[in-house]
Amino acid sequence: MFFTKPRLHRIITHNLHHLLSPHLLLSEISGSLGDLGTLLPLLLALSLQGSIDLPSTLLFSGLFNILTGLVFGVPLPVQPMKAIAAASLQENADLETTVAAGAWVGFAVLLLGGTGGLKRVMRWVPGAVVRGVQVGAGMSLVVAAGGGMVRPLGWLWTPEENENGHGGLGEWLDSRALAVLAFGGLVVGLGQQQQQQQQSGEKPQERRKKRSKMPVQVPYALVLFLVGIMFAVVRVSLSKDSPQSPPPPPHDQPTNSAPPWTWIWNPLNHIHPKVFRSLLNPQALSMAIAQLPLTTLNSIIAASALASDLFPPDSYPQLYADDESSDSPLSPSPSASSSSLSSAPPQTPSAETPKPLSSPTSAEEGPVPLTPLSLSISAMNLLSAPFGCMPLCHGSGGLAAQHRFGARSGTSIILLGLTKFLLGLFFPGPGLLGLLGKFPKAFLGVMVLGAGVELARVGVRNVEGEEQDRMVMLMTAGTILAFKNDGVGFLAGMGCYGGFRVAAWLGGGTEKGRGGEQGLLGEEEEEEEQGRVDEESPLLR
């Protein structure tokens, strides 16, 4: 049994141990920031576009962060659904369509988790198509960042016209020049990240020696976000010099007209009944179809397997279901207690190279089993959809990122969730969205670009094997970019994969690889082709 009183008691004790220990608490706080590079860009971009309700998203995602940390006891993140977010930004989808797409995924995941259909999806959908959706979604974010956010800006300033035709002084705080500077910082951050990945294969003594000479790593998205907020505050204060009425909220998003002292989140002011009618919108269905394999394989199966790898039963027995480990002491084991930011185990998988589909058995019996994880994702989206919350899921990449930054318990995401919950509860008025409306598009574009490149890089690096697999991935990603429709890209990738299988069957090819991946070349050609592929170095590796 997973949801048992003794297990929950052990998890609470595990979380409290990390909360009350000063050096472990610092590691948990550091780990909670590890996944902000994905959350902040998409949260800001979707909020400013009017595709989500920002206060509801902060409140519900914070609440789900807290519940996830209490139930699972591991730093399992609550992330945006990236394929839906990318499609929404590229297609300028309204709030109802975006949220309805997340609700459809919630329905599907609930059905799959309740009927045991996750393994069937794992067999039916080839990995190359899933990676193609990742690459296509990532490149869609890059296109949205460059074409919709940075390109309209001026090189040194961006004119801001108000009702009286006067430009605001804040126009100097948003330009392409700022975007170039922010992009330079992003490239430096990527270089430091690559250096850390190279050190993961070195001896522990050499790695600790090099780490001691390096400055403390802070998520670049967090730095850019804080600087952008300061710029936004300055722009808001400067805009008072010339009378200017705030623009209407995009997509007719409701605002709270109550006095400032009553700006506490009220469900009556944030309910969106049109979400249910948008369930029949073909655009929402298309976005959900593209997101479903990504959620099933990466957010459920890969996250479950990765949790078992990062938190093995011999080091973290308190996180496992009641079996032979149920008689273990309530306090965390010494190896778990001594884990900190400076002593991360060298075998920790990186956020770019999780281990999807590596161990289904351990994934079902690990600290994050498949069925509870799928129920968690469906509950998050179905319960929050009427309030316009951003489509949410868990993720293996975010789990690895937070673990790398020092998170070893649910304390990290509980602290992050508490912060988001309080922001959504006490700052739901129009002032918060107005402040974000002054957030420099230069910084936002670079943040979204970084998130898109990171998402695409994961897809590119996880495609291994035959040339046909890469062709399927490119067909999927290219069709997504060409038609600006993730569903069309998914169907194109499946059609390409099916065509290769038919050609292999007609030509007497053999089936090779996990999950039905095909090896369509002969043995000699296959060895020669594989040797050539191994000599190539993927971009940003």
UniProtKB/Swiss-Prot annotation:
Gene inactivation effect: Resistance to molybdate.
A Gene Ontology BP annotation from the UniProt entry: molybdate ion export from vacuole
Organism: Neurospora crassa (strain ATCC 24698 / 74-OR23-1A / CBS 708.71 / DSM 1257 / FGSC 987)
UniProt-recorded name of the protein: Molybdate transporter 1
Function per UniProt: Exports stored molybdate from the vacuole into the cytosol, making it available for molybdate cofactor (Moco) biosynthesis. Plays a role in molybdate homeostasis as high cytosolic levels of molybdate are toxic to cells. Not required for molybdate import into cells.
Keyword Thylakoid: no
Intracellular or extracellular location(s): Vacuole membrane
GO cellular component: vacuolar membrane
Superkingdom per UniProt: Eukaryota
TM ranges: 24-44, 58-78, 98-118, 137-157, 168-188, 214-234, 287-307, 413-433, 435-455
Region described as Disordered: spans on this chain: 193-213, 317-366, 510-541
Broad class of where this protein is predominantly found: membrane
Keyword line: Membrane, Molybdenum, Transmembrane, Transmembrane helix, Transport, Vacuole
Topology versus the membrane: Multi-pass membrane protein
Gene Ontology MF terms in the entry: molybdate ion transmembrane transporter activity
Record family assignment: Belongs to the SLC26A/SulP transporter (TC 2.A.53) family.
Low complexity compositional bias, start-end: 327-351
PANTHER family: MOLYBDATE TRANSPORTER 2, PTHR31970
Pfam families from the UniProt entry: MFS_MOT1
